[in-house]
């Protein structure tokens, strides 16, 4: 079982324009917020942590981080369980006007999502498994806008109410298809995983009528990792070096939602083996990653443990 937390990253994104509150394309922004949430639904090191900030070009700020993991319970009963928790903050700027003057309205949209998955491993050939997974998600988007002044004080209705203190409750249903190759030998360990995910997000409950939202979250992810022992020992076990390469292609509403259609990640790190001792954690990894895609690039640090 593994649990991965990526703790830092920075990338730059394409510019977008601020919106006008009157006919504000608020619905598009809500769908965009759900699109941002889509990036935190499944374990993916390319979006484990993202920070988009391009204030000079009026690009909405975005910060996102996830914590997730998954494991097959046993070889005898190969049920697979996974879970991901994601947090994001999306800060679009709207413009209110009374026909004569304009006022910028900064907003902060915070979202939290929890996604679970349950699947089953079917052996294909030695070291290769096919894994269908059923996924389910719950999430919330909360808006906090500092709206004041005569320009917007006279404006009433769902749009302004939502910007001031609105919430959007979201659920998601879908699934994933995974091919998982694991070849573990004393001289090296190879992991390769190909995953297609499709989760449909939809708002529900007492949501403002003006901001009903939905998002089609689809992605194809190819993840690979090579681990091999070094000449150094710690805790009576060799310290391993780790090489990692990942490519994620975004589909559906995720494609282009943040200014790119795909992301790549190259990583290098070290792994500490504590399996000789009677402790809960058997391995600990620290991986430095370089992430890049169309018009975006950045770095991150990933921390992971195995049980």
Per-range role (PLM):
Residues 204, 209-307:
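Outer membrane beta-barrel transmembrane domains
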Residues 71-80, 123-130, 182-190, 230-240, ...:
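Short loop/turn motifs that connect adjacent beta-strands in outer-membrane beta-barrel proteins
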Residues 51-62, 90-111, 141-170, 201-207, ...:
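Extracellular/periplasm-exposed beta-strand and loop segments of Gram-negative cell-envelope proteins
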Residues 14-102:
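Short glycine/proline- and aromatic-enriched beta-strand/turn motifs that initiate or cap beta-hairpins
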Residues 85-91, 120-122, 136-144, 181-185, ...:
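Transmembrane beta-strands of outer-membrane beta-barrel pores
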Residues 59-67, 77-79, 108-114, 128, ...:
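Residues that define the transmembrane beta-barrel architecture of outer-membrane proteins
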Residues 67-73, 114-122, 175-183, 194-198, ...:
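Residues on the lipid-exposed face of transmembrane beta-strands in outer-membrane beta-barrel proteins
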Residues 79-83, 130-136, 173-175, 188-196, ...:
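Transmembrane beta-strands of outer-membrane beta-barrel proteins
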């Amino acid at each position: 079982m593994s649990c991965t937390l990526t703790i830092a990253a920075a990338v730059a994104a394409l510019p977008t324009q601020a919106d006008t509150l009157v006919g504000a394309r608020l619905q598009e922004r809500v769908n965009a917020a759900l699109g941002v949430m889509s990036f935190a639904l499944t374990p993916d090191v390319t979006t484990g942590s993202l920070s988009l900030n391009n204030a000079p070009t009026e690009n909405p700020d975005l910060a996102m981080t996830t914590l997730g993991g998954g494991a097959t319970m046993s070889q005898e009963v190969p049920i697979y369980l996974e879970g991901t928790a994601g947090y994001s903050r999306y800060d679009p700027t709207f413009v209110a006007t009374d026909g004569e003057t304009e006022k910028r309205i900064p907003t902060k949209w915070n979202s939290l999502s929890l996604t679970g998955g349950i699947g089953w491993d079917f052996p294909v050939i030695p070291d290769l498994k096919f894994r269908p997974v059923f996924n389910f998600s719950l999430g919330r988007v909360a808006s906090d806008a500092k709206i004041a002044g005569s320009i917007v004080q006279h404006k009433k209705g769902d749009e302004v109410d939502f910007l001031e203190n609105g919430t959007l409750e979201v659920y998601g249903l879908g699934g994933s298809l995974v091919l998982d190759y694991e070849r573990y030998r004393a001289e090296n360990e190879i992991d390769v995983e190909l995953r297609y995910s499709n989760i449909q997000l939809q708002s529900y409950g007492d949501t403002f009528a003006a901001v009903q939202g939905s998002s089609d979250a689809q992605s194809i992810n190819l993840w690979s990792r090579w681990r091999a022992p070094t000449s150094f020992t710690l805790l009576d076990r060799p310290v391993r070096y780790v090489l990692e390469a990942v490519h994620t292609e975004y589909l559906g509403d995720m494609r282009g939602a943040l200014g790119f259609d795909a992301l790549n990640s190259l990583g290098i790190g070290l792994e500490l083996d504590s399996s000789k001792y009677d402790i809960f954690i058997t391995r600990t990894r620290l991986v430095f990653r370089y992430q890049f895609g169309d018009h975006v690039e950045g770095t991150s640090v990933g921390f992971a443990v195995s049980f």
